[in-house]
Amino acid sequence: MSWQVRNGWYFPLGCLLVAVAGPSGVIAFQQRTSQQSPRNASTPKLGDSKVNPIDGLRYVWIPPGSFTDGCSQGDKECFEDESPPRKVTLTRGFWLGQTEVTQAAYQKVMGYNPSVIEGPGYPADSISWVEANVYCTAIGGRLPSEAEWEYAARGGTTSARYGNLDEIAWYVHNSDFTSHPVARKKPNAYGLYDMLGNVLEWTDTWYWVQHNQENINPTGPSIAEYKELRGGGWWDNQDLVRASYRIRLETTDLDYDIGFRCAAN
């Protein structure tokens, strides 16, 4: 099968995108593609970015590496399910949305906007895991694992937050009880905005009360009752707006402080 390159994203020529009814009536997209890998793809590096031609959002390269996952040293606000901290190694780099998925992008891809707090540059909110997963699949991506999310959010730091909270995040003490347009606060060292605060972000990892003990490319349990969200939101107190904070919800749950960002291989 031949591959077409559009703005650095690989799409197989002749790919068939099929719409099917998913859970809760959501339209899902299934791609019938070859398993063949594109050839001669250059290896990206930290600082590289590209625009996805489908949703128009920018994605940044997160290189492989190791980090301490879970409760940060000296963090007195941790919950039991954030411990014990352990060294995790991600052997594969990945692309991650520079911002949370905006309402303009969501409308463009999905054809509707379920958000309660409306504005094209605001993060899409009131999004279930099912809908977030459909969106990321439709643009040729996926949701990040919880390990990928935390590694990217920390941006090479080892503390609970990657900067002064008021400078990097919208949370209950500075949000005026609403979300805000993306990328209005300072990014982390990887160039990612709003990894903490604004809206909670879905991951692709099933929640397990014991902190995952896998150390290499952890994926979590194969099935469980809840999916995991990260980052805290505009409604949360500062003790919940930390890199290691974990929250879980059912895949069809949604609220107006819940959004997401996509990853891609």
Predicted regions and their residues:
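Short aromatic-cysteine micro-motif
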Residues: 50, 54-55, 79-157, 175-193, ...
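Hydrophobic alpha-helical membrane-insertion segments, chiefly the h-region
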Residues: 17-29
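Acidic glycine-/aspartate-rich tracts in secreted/extracellular proteins
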Residues: 65, 72-74, 101, 113, ...
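Surface-exposed recognition segments
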Residues: 75-88, 178, 196-265
